[in-house]
Swiss-Prot record:
Alphabetized SUPFAM superfamilies for the sequence: POZ domain, TRAF domain-like
Reported phenotype of the disruption mutant: RNAi-mediated knockdown at L1 larval stage results in the disorganization of myosin thick filaments in adult body wall muscles characterized by the formation of abnormal myosin heavy chain myo-3 aggregates and V-shaped crossing of A-bands. RNAi-mediated knockdown of mel-26 also results in increased lifespan.
Tissue occurrence: Expressed in body wall muscles.
UniProt effect for mutating C94Y: Severe loss of interaction with ppfr-1 and mei-1
Organism: Caenorhabditis elegans
Gene: mel-26
Short name of any one Pfam family annotated for the protein: MATH_2
Biological function: Probable substrate-specific adapter of an E3 ubiquitin-protein ligase complex which mediates the ubiquitination and subsequent proteasomal degradation of target proteins. Controls degradation of microtubule severing protein mei-1 after meiosis. Controls degradation of ppfr-1, the regulatory subunit of PP4 complex, after meiosis. In body wall muscles, involved in the organization of myosin thick filaments, likely by regulating the degradation of mei-1 downstream of unc-89. May also activate the TORC1 pathway.
Keywords: Cytoplasm, Ubl conjugation pathway
GO molecular function, one term: ubiquitin protein ligase binding
Domain MATH: 41-162
Primary residence: cytoplasm
GO biological process: cellular response to L-leucine; embryo development ending in birth or egg hatching; establishment of mitotic spindle orientation; negative regulation of autophagy; positive regulation of cell growth; positive regulation of TORC1 signaling; proteasome-mediated ubiquitin-dependent protein catabolic process; protein catabolic process
Protein name: Protein maternal effect lethal 26
Subunit composition and interactions: Interacts (via BTB domain) with cul-3. Seems to be a component of a E3 ubiquitin-protein ligase complex containing cul-3. Interacts (probably via MATH domain) with mei-1, which targets mei-1 for ubiquitin-mediated proteolysis. Interacts (probably via MATH domain) with ppfr-1, the regulatory subunit of the PP4 complex; targets ppfr-1 for ubiquitin-mediated proteolysis. May interact (via MATH domain) with unc-89 (via Ig-like C2-type domain 2/3 and, Ig-like C2-type domain 50 and fibronectin type-III domain 2).
Amino acid sequence: MEPRIDGGVFIGGIGNSGNEMCSNGVPALGVSSQTEIKVEKVQHTWTVKNFSHCYQEYLENFVYLQRGDEQLTWSIKIYPKGNGENNKDFVFLCLNRVINNNVKAGKIGFKSQFKLRTAENKDIEMRIHPNPSHSDYVSYIKRDVLFPQIMPRDMIIVNVEIDVAVETITTTNEPIQFEPTNSEQQLIEDYQRLFSQELLCDFAINVNGKIIRAHKAVLAARSPVFNAMLTHQDTDEAKSSMMYINDMDYDVIYEMVYYIYCGRCNKDITDMATALLIAADKYRLEELKSHCEKYLVENINIENACSLLIIGDLYSAPKLRKRAVTYILARPKNVTGTPGWEDILKGHPNLITDIFSQIDRQSSTGATSSVSNLPGVPMDIPGITGNIVPPPSGL
């Protein structure tokens, strides 16, 4: 049961929040604001000795916070036997804001708490009154609970902590215009400079006697093949910080390493797209390989269709392979007269089978090409003795 607190006048209160809105209730576009409630902390320790011999109605002490010319004051009162006949079995600790008559009264928001301790600095548990009628803050404890804890030294230590909301400040921030930046482009330029100026290089690639200097970390980060080569300390390349390439042209490897650094090609790849695709496949540079494959697909012609079909098959470039087959089927008489067709006949007969399979698929779907799409119609294919009859669809 809560003890009753008799009489008195409530003093103090909570200050305004200081929130501000635009006249239409919506912040202006591009403008932001910030509200800060400044809080100052007040701490005070009050020691009372021979507490059991306190016979007056209450003990009083004061806590101060100086702010410029203004001094904020709080009264701390200890009621050894309550403040009335109805609660004489309780000890009260009360806190009140004291209004100075010489200072303009204003609402100051604050939060407070009491901590009661013994002479041995052990906490004494108190209860907080939920709705005091005569004070801003009240804690209480029964006398028969308190006194056994403070004996035999008969001393209490009262710690009061007050958090005071002294000021509310709202600031408005005008938008600041920054020049747009292109961090991706800047990154490319930085890595291009790192490569072209050979800054802090720790690795060399010897291509037929010509040196390309690079950085192990960059190569390992971009290529799984380089990663495996350079992170295993027992490889020759990791030990010597040098690798040798004798089966590819210097220009192709230089372009490949440039792409590793910059994510784009340094120059026109017309004369090296096929070789660059092969290099990208070897070092598992999927982006570069896809870039080369796209270029070759867009530049397929009668003279290179067969060789690109072989490249697409050997180096797992499915889009290039498919485009080459489609191109050959659309121009069989022209394509089969090229040296590339001879290469297919001699070294890659499996591709002939794939071409006929494509004819069969076109027949079953009703698609048309320059090659007869009717099953059982003989076709004269250069390099193959006799007439080749594609199998009927559905078998």
